Amino acid sequence: VLGYELDLGELSPQEKKQVAAQIEWYKEYRPTLQYGDFFRVPIRRQGLVSWAAVAPDKKQAVVLLAQRLCTAAPPADHLTVPALLPTARYRVTAVPQQVAVARFGGLVKHIAPVKLSADGLVLRTVNRHYALPDGSFTAEASGAALAAGIPLNDQFLGTGYHEGLRLWGDFGSQLYLVEQLGENEEDHTK
């Protein structure tokens, strides 16, 4: 199920760390991805696609939400997770991912205190060793609420940045891990 179609020797040190973290994450959740029930999830707006793998015991799910092309001022996105236990409580967490600073191109020079070239030495060096957190998200909800869809953080619209902002752009995507809360785990939504 997991594969990379790229030359690993051409990756920056930052990208190599990201690939290693992705492989470790996949190994941990492989049973759900390989043996869970697989669903194409209905989506509320055009341009998005979603797939979910739900563990047979309904205690865990992995959901992909992907965007084809970015649109100006998109409506709020919702994450829908089918086939969970309606009365059970779940924690939803965005699988950590990062975005290269270079993705912002010439926008960086507008916020930097000194004049920088978008393809100059400083930004190329930063890009090799640092990336911005993308789309940090955690929520708790019932299986019924997840089946109806819960709202997600906004996407980047050209200005401003915070860790929870989704920096998708064209063909952007995010994986979400959904895990049932144990009886001894605190429900942070009360």
Language-model segments: residues:
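Active-site-proximal substrate-binding groove within the catalytic cores of carbohydrate-active enzymes
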Residues: V1-L152, F156, Y176
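Mature N-terminal, pre-catalytic/accessory segment of carbohydrate-active enzymes
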Residues: Y161, L165-S173, E179-K190
